[in-house]
Amino acid sequence: MFHDLLEFNEEVLDAINDKNPIVALESTIISHGMPYPDNLTTAIEVENIIRRQGAIPATIAMHQGKIRVGLTQEVMEHLALQKEVIKASRRDISFVLSRKVTASTTVAATMFCAHMAKLPLFVTGGIGGVHQDVTMSFDISADLIELSNTPVTVVCSGAKSILDLPKTLEVLETFGVPVIGYATDEFPAFYSRSSGIPVPQRLNSAEEVANLMSIQQKLNMKNGIVVANPIPVSAELSDEEISPYIKQAHDEAKHMSGKSLTPFLLKRIAELTAGKSLEANIELIKNNAFLGAEIAIAYQKKLFSKKT
């Protein structure tokens, strides 16, 4: 039985009933992460990549008083086009549902909703983390708190490179969150494959990640797992290339804080790089969707083999 505030589309409900692998997806990338029409076309392509691999996509958002798990084309277009769509983290979920307004879900909110829907795997571009001026703003993403207490595996390209990556990893360590480098020994820096920061553990196949998820589930551990998957070589922007633009965007955003900061920085960096950072963002989320589908399939096989 599922909570009555959850509403599944037919494709996801069929997958649940047929015990097929499902990959949860966030919706903030549609409403706040990219400009139109790239946001909509990317969201559709990411879902199709997951389907082609043999899994089912479940993009999550809140609409008309329900947590929608799997979106219609109409709701996707609404998220992509409407300026009034709220960017909802965990703390906003109750308010959004009570007001019956439309909201996209951040990493934290998507993890919460995915866990409610009994979905163990979630794909995104990059997690939030500790902001660079943390000593002044104390701006630490709720994503890190959610990773510490919600058992959902998050496939990402590390944390967004606009953040303080060493401090972000320190917080994850303090919270007991495993950070796995997927076929890499260094923590990816979103637009770049390498940050120069070593990852605590490395795994090299979807089956190995699925086994880790299975062990965590057997131990009844309540935290999530970060699977850090580097951007493809062909799409990456070197640290030397992207860093000056990140610094300039930060300088321009000195008096900004809260939910509006990250969307502003991503948009401004895209402008400064003449769209190169947007192209990189699109390619890394597609790559993460491909890997996420592989892991979901391997994990479902593992679950099924235990019960036969």
Curated annotation (Swiss-Prot):
Binds 1 Mn(2+) ion per subunit. Its cofactor is Mn(2+). It comes from the Bacteria. GO terms for biological process: nucleobase catabolic process. Its EC number is 4.2.1.70. It is an enzyme of class 4 (lyase). Substrate binds at residues 87, 107, 141-143. The keyword Protein transport does not apply. The active site is at 26 (proton donor), 160 (nucleophile). It catalyses: D-ribose 5-phosphate + uracil = psi-UMP + H2O. It holds the Pfam family Indigoidine_A. Keywords: Glycosidase, Hydrolase, Lyase, Manganese, Metal-binding. One of its GO terms (molecular function) is pseudouridylate synthase activity. The keyword Methyltransferase does not apply. Mn(2+) binds at residue 139. One of its GO terms (cellular component) is cytoplasm. Homotrimer. Catalyzes the reversible cleavage of pseudouridine 5'-phosphate (PsiMP) to ribose 5-phosphate and uracil. Functions biologically in the cleavage direction, as part of a pseudouridine degradation pathway. HAMAP family: PsiMP_glycosidase. Belongs to the pseudouridine-5'-phosphate glycosidase family. This is Pseudouridine-5'-phosphate glycosidase. It comes from Legionella pneumophila subsp. pneumophila (strain Philadelphia 1 / ATCC 33152 / DSM 7513).
